[in-house]
Design a protein with these regions (language model features):
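Short glycine/proline- and aromatic-enriched beta-strand/turn motifs that initiate or cap beta-hairpins
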Residues: 20-73, 236, 242-244
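Outer-membrane beta-barrel strand-turn architecture
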Residues: 32, 82-86, 144-148, 189-192, ...
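Residues that define the transmembrane beta-barrel architecture of outer-membrane proteins
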Residues: 34-36, 70-74, 130-136, 150, ...
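Transmembrane beta-strands of outer-membrane beta-barrel proteins
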Residues: 36-42, 90-94, 136, 152-158, ...
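Transmembrane beta-strands of outer-membrane beta-barrel pores
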Residues: 44-48, 96-100, 144, 158-164, ...
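Repeated loop/turn-to-beta-strand initiation elements of outer-membrane beta-barrel proteins
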Residues: 48, 88-90, 148, 193-196
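Glycine- and aromatic-enriched membrane insertion/assembly motifs of diderm outer-membrane
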Residues: 57-114
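Predominantly the C-terminal beta-signal and adjacent terminal strand-loop region
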Residues: 192-244
Length: 244
């Protein structure tokens, strides 16, 4: 992730250097001087969890969980942007993220072992958890000097999140609320009638989301899967296109 951020920073610095070579007519020259303005954004995201396995056996079985791949989800929200000074803005962006996560549980010691019809060997189990997050990020935006019709920026802050897609009875149940920090990078592109702002953001949850009380599980065979985990914290990568 550090390498990715370095590449992004180098890219924006290179673009700024190239654009600075020739002055152009500026679209919306006073757009950034508004005390407050509204907008909206749409984009894609990938949800993930940092999982901590217990390594503890349940009924003689030791399972290890992972999220092997990411499924892209859809994000949409509104933007409220308040002017602080020529370089800093305060931004509030309520957003809803529609997505899911696929868990894969494995028993390494049983992989490759063949069972019988009477005693089948189960070495892998998979399940999906749908998470529709309603997030409320509060960020500070630092914008570089505007060059022609482009202005790169950095953004960072905190967020609260509520999971609207929780469903009891699933082997993995996540808590309904989360809190974390986020940071990102973007660029304001000044068009004749509005600003288009591609933005890449990274979010890291600070709350253990794993629900440990699983009295809702009616199938006792499933309890070994949540018992194989001790902690789960969220993280998300979001690519949005802001219109303001």
């Amino acid at each position: 992730m550090r390498r990715l951020l370095f590449i992004i920073c180098v890219f924006f610095l290179s673009v700024t250097a190239v654009m600075a070579q020739k002055e152009k007519v500026k679209n919306q020259p006073y757009a950034d001087l508004k005390w407050f303005h509204l907008g909206f954004h749409v984009g894609l995201h990938a949800q993930d969890l940092i999982l901590t396995n217990t390594g503890v056996a349940t009924n003689g079985e030791t399972w290890y969980a992972e999220i092997p791949s990411y499924s892209p989800g859809f994000s949409v929200g509104v933007i409220g942007d308040m002017y602080l000074n020529p370089y800093f803005n305060l931004r509030f962006t309520p957003t809803i993220h529609f997505g899911d996560k696929k868990f894969v549980f494995r028993r390494p010691e049983m992989e490759g072992v063949e069972g019988t019809d009477e005693n089948p060997v189960v070495s892998m189990y998979s399940t999906s958890v749908r998470s529709n997050y309603l997030t409320f990020p509060l960020d500070v935006k630092y914008s570089a000097f505007r060059v022609n019709n482009y202005r790169p920026y950095l953004i960072g802050g905190i967020y609260g999140a509520f999971d609207l897609g929780r469903k009891k009875g699933n082997p993995i149940l996540l808590k309904g609320t989360d809190f974390g920090v986020e940071f990102g990078i973007g660029c304001d592109i000044y068009l004749p009638f509005f600003k288009l702002c591609p933005e890449l953001k990274f979010s890291f949850g600070l709350v253990d989301l794993l629900e440990k009380d699983r009295s809702d599980l009616t199938d006792l065979e499933l309890i070994k899967y949540p018992n194989s985990l001790s902690k789960a914290t969220s993280r998300m990568v979001t690519l949005t296109f802001n219109f303001a």
